[in-house]
Design a protein with these regions (language model features):
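Membrane-interface "cap" regions at the ends of multi-pass membrane proteins
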Residues: 1-32, 61-66, 70-83, 87-94, ...
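Helix-loop-helix connectors at the membrane interface of multi-pass transporters/channels
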Residues: 2-4, 78, 111-140, 241-244, ...
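Membrane-embedded translocation segments of transport machinery
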Residues: 2-7, 11, 15, 169, ...
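Inter-helical loop and helix-membrane interface segments of multi-pass membrane transporters/permeases
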Residues: 5-8, 37-41, 76-95, 108-167, ...
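Loop-to-transmembrane helix boundary motifs in multi-pass membrane proteins
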Residues: 10, 16-17, 24, 142-147, ...
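Transmembrane helix-boundary motif of multi-pass solute transporters/channels
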Residues: 13-53, 238, 249-252, 256-259, ...
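Extracellular loop-to-transmembrane helix junctions
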Residues: 38-64, 144, 391-395
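C-terminal membrane-solvent junction of multi-pass transporters and transport-like membrane proteins
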Residues: 91-97, 340-351, 384-441
Length: 458
């Protein structure tokens, strides 16, 4: 092993990898998108399809990316270049590397919104925040959004500056158990409300009558984005994984963790909405309106609304922070590997990039609302469309091609089974990566772009 590989940062244990990777996967999408899609596309049948895709498609992609990272001990650019110097390898690596650099600024803007609402509930603004006008006025105020964006950004980069073991691993090990406890407490509170059982039944019990093609497409897209696939994160974190750890067992724990939080989010939100709306799931809206308008209205109508609001936004804050940390680490790792910069210099440069691009997003609903791109998209929406709908599916397709055409499925299997580690679902991996994963990724790319262009509606 080269001296460069010996010096590379590593997670100290399997738990460190699992909680850090789970922290990257458990994010805002689990809380503001999964419950909405589950409610819209059949409840229990959506959940069943989602679980099947997680055990096949999701499993295959996180195994592939983690194995590529560990076998090369490189961030995405170096990992792809390890297998060839052709321009296609460079392009595949750089697409994976650029994605987190573009996502983390606007993601941190939304993280700042979460900080603002958490602070608001702590201050006791429960009634004021239960109005759509409160949210609209806040995101339209450039000074306030920029302030909270910078607060969140500094928190993220402070953890990154501390390093892998002393920063990311310690923070994830502290935050993720608390996140689970909060999710369980809020779910118990939601499902014990009068009238909540109808929502629980709708969410958990499959009804084949609710099945449609869009159930599969929406579940596929949600699973893809939820697991941090094609963001460079799993390749980077895989490169920090010790050689004696089982890739299959570790990534399976990440799958379970991410799915459990998504299910708890569904139990937390869907029954509460059923109670609030007298059994009408159509009031659920995806994205910011669910988290910053609908949920505050529900909290205001509940007993102990202020306490529930604090717990909910603390949960969302932990989810947003751990995901942003993972995105930032992937970017910093690329700077260190490709430009040979120190962690300090890489962190400072990322700070400058985040402030520049994040400010565009922070002001996109206020002072810069007159500037739109493509289909009248504000900056934040455009960055989200570019990365999630276009670049990530392309990056995932590049990973499939790299594994099948260059490394070979047996090459990945050899890495997974290093030191006699298990690879129990090897047959599933081989079939999925060769045949179904590229097909699924193509569907995600088409449906994502078509959805934004208005050809189909989610």
């Amino acid at each position: 092993m080269s001296s460069e590989k010996q010096k590379r940062s590593k997670f100290s244990s399997r738990l460190g990898f699992v909680l850090s990777a789970a922290g990257s996967a458990v994010g805002l999408g689990n809380i503001w998108r999964f419950p909405y899609l589950a409610a819209k596309y059949g409840g229990g049948i959506f959940l069943l399809v989602y679980l099947l895709l997680m055990l096949t498609f999701g499993y295959t992609m996180i195994i592939a990316e983690s194995a590529i990272g560990r076998m090369t001990r490189k961030s995405p650019v170096g990992a792809y270049a390890h297998f060839g110097k052709d321009w296609m390898f460079k392009a595949g690596g750089w697409i994976n590397a650029i994605i987190p650099i573009l996502i983390v600024p606007y993601y941190s803007v939304i993280g700042g919104w979460v900080c603002k609402y958490l602070f608001g509930y702590i201050q006791g603004e429960t009634e004021a925040m239960a109005t759509a006008e409160y949210f609209t006025e806040f995101i339209g105020n450039g000074v306030k959004t920029e302030f909270w964006f910078l607060i969140f950004t500094l928190l993220v980069l402070w953890v990154i500056f501390m390093g892998v073991e002393n920063g990311i691993e310690k923070v994830s090990t502290f935050m993720m158990p608390i996140l689970v406890i909060l999710a369980i407490l809020l779910s118990i509170y939601a499902i014990t409300r009068k009238g909540a059982f109808a929502g629980v039944k709708y969410f958990l019990v499959p009804n084949i009558k609710n099945f449609s093609w869009m159930t599969v497409v929406s579940a596929m897209g949600q699973m893809f984005y939820s697991l941090s696939i094609a963001m460079g994160i799993l390749i980077t974190f895989g490169s920090y994984m010790k050689s004696d750890l089982s890739i299959e067992e570790s990534t399976s724990h990440v799958e379970v963790f991410d799915t459990a939080i998504a299910v708890l989010a569904g139990l937390m939100i869907i029954p509460a909405v059923f109670v609030f709306s007298n059994g009408d799931p159509s009031v659920l809206k995806a994205g910011p309106s669910l988290m910053f308008i609908t949920m505050p209205k529900i909290f205001a109508s509940m007993g102990f609304g202020r306490v529930v609001g604090i717990l909910f936004f603390a949960l969302v804050f932990f989810a947003a922070l751990t995901s942003a940390i993972a995105l930032a680490e992937s970017a910093v790792s690329t700077f260190q590997d490709e430009l040979k910069w120190s962690r300090r210099r890489s962190t400072v440069v990322l700070l400058l990039i985040m402030v520049a691009l994040g400010t565009l997003s922070a002001l996109s609903y206020g002072p810069l609302s007159f500037v739109t791109i493509l289909k009248n998209m504000p900056f934040l929406d455009f960055f989200d469309f570019l990365t999630n709908s276009v670049m990530m599916p392309i990056a995932a397709m590049a990973t499939c091609l790299l594994v099948v055409r260059v490394i070979g499925v047996e090459g990945i299997a050899a890495e997974v089974m290093r030191k006699d580690a298990p690879f129990k679902r090897k047959a599933v991996f081989n079939f999925m990566i060769k045949y179904l994963c590229p097909f699924f990724v193509a569907i995600i790319l088409f449906s994502s772009v078509a959805g934004v262009l208005g050809w189909i509606k989610f």
